Amino acid sequence: MADGANDGGNPGAEEQQRLLDQHKEAHFTAGEIVRDIIIGVSDGLTVPFALAAGLSGANASSSIVLTAGIAEVAAGAISMGLGGYLAAKSEADNYARELKREQEEIIRVPDTEAAEVAEILARYGIEPHEYGPVVNALRKKPQAWLDFMMKFELGLEKPDPKRALQSAFTIAIAYVLGGLVPLIPYMFIPVARKAVVASVILTLMALLIFGYAKGYFTDNKPFKSALQTALIGAIASAAAFGMAKAVQS
């Protein structure tokens, strides 16, 4: 028998490790951060943009639009960041609660939990004579057993303890960066009616770029994503501008 292979013709442990070292899969693993950035930037670009357009439609001066816009960006960043923190914290609390319950069940009803392991493995087409040794091996390793049940029975991944704060800051910063874009023209153009035109052009360009990047990272047709994102922003700003003009008249 050749070294590094077992009797069944499968690669041995050393050969398996060598194959794994040679094959590095290019999976994208920063999904949660990207999700937070998408949430923050999309809202940051759209909400202040609509607010600025609405105030411009009401004939407010650029200074008023800028002041109101910055106030909204600050409040929005705090609100969105807090929402991200609470969502991540709730997820972590739920994981801890389910982990404790699963630990208690493994101790109290081990046979039932072992049967659940067998049922899970059977769903993947593994036969009883094949999953039997796996079930027995897991019963001898409580932590591995617990991890298996959390992931495959409940579909829960252990959350990063830093996730809540990371989510809060990522969403808040992304919101600020996105929210300042539609306000930039009002910093340099004193007449709001002229500034709003520049704001529309600048923001739509930013929405197109952001939408393309979002589609690229989420593997969701970048050009289609760019057009959809820009369209949503355009509709929001047009609605706000039109409502302001209607109220004014």
Curated annotation (Swiss-Prot):
Changing M80A: Strongly reduces transport of iron ions. Fe cation 2 binds at E102, E113, E116, M149. Changing D36A: Significantly reduces transport of iron ions. InterPro entries: Ccc1_fam (IPR008217). Residues 1-36, 85-170, 216-226 are cytoplasmic. It is a multi-pass membrane protein. Transport of iron ions is inhibited by zinc ions. Fe cation 1 binds at E102, E105, E113, E116, E153. The chain crosses the membrane at residues 37-57, 64-84, 171-191, 195-215, 227-247. Changing E116Q: Strongly reduces transport of iron ions. Fe cation 3 binds at E105, E113, E116. Changing E113Q: Strongly reduces transport of iron ions. GO terms for biological process: intracellular manganese ion homeostasis; iron ion transport. Homodimer. The dimeric interaction is mediated by both the transmembrane domains (TMDs) and the cytoplasmic metal binding domain (MBD). Can mediate sequestration of iron ions into vacuoles when expressed in the yeast ccc1 mutant. This is Vacuolar iron transporter 1. The lineage of its organism: Eukaryota, Viridiplantae, Streptophyta, Embryophyta, Tracheophyta. The gene is VIT1.
